[in-house]
Amino acid sequence: KETSDQDMIRTFCNPPKKSATNESVIVIDAGGTNFRSCLVTFDAAGAATISEMEKTRMPGVERELSRKEFFEQFAVNLEHLKNKADRIGFCFSYPMEIQKDGDGILLGFSKEVKAPEVVGCKVGECLKEALAAHGWNTIKRITMCNDTVSALLAGAACAGETHRYSSYIGYILGT
């Protein structure tokens, strides 16, 4: 087995076979310093509109958090999007083992985040539990992707139906 200085963790996140239409999805970007969230609404033609964008501090940066506190802060950060969609696309910028159901098991934190009890947890499942505790309607699906995969899929999606390329690259330079 070859070794590498880069984590190469497989993903089960593929581009959708067809563009979403007439629906909304909650989108989260949890990075090294910031936690961003918004609602993305697709019209009848599949064009996306971003609304209700908020940026807060990433939980666990200011002090060490327990697992419960970590996901509780996620739920608080998402309160402005409560019950506005039943699916979540989650760009989580930390190494995860992506599962076939779209969830991700956290392998470890990098950067400044301090929440050691979260390591080994299914991030999407824990988030669903925290949202339910805040009175959210049932979330049907949370799809986890790391930042590089998210960049790759976004680039492929932006190409649209009229521009197809032989390959795509997702590239994250610094944070």
Segment roles from a protein language model:
Residues A30-G31, M53-P59, F90-P95:
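Short loop/turn segments at strand-loop or loop-helix junctions that form parts
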Residues R36-C38, F42-A45, S51-E62, E72-L81:
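Extended mixed-charge, aromatic/glycine-enriched low-complexity segments
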Residues K55-E72, M96-I169:
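Glycine-rich phosphate-binding loop and adjoining helix at the ATP-binding site
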Residues C13-S51, I98, Y165-T175:
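Gly/Thr-rich phosphate-binding beta-strand-loop-beta motif of the actin/hexokinase/Hsp70
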Residues F74-R87, A130-W136:
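Phosphate/pyrophosphate-binding loops at sites that engage ATP/ADP/AMP, CoA/4′-phosphopantetheine
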Residues K1-K17, C145-N146:
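Charged, flexible boundary elements
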Residues V25-I26, K84-S93, I142-T143:
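Short glycine-rich phosphate-binding loop at a beta-alpha junction
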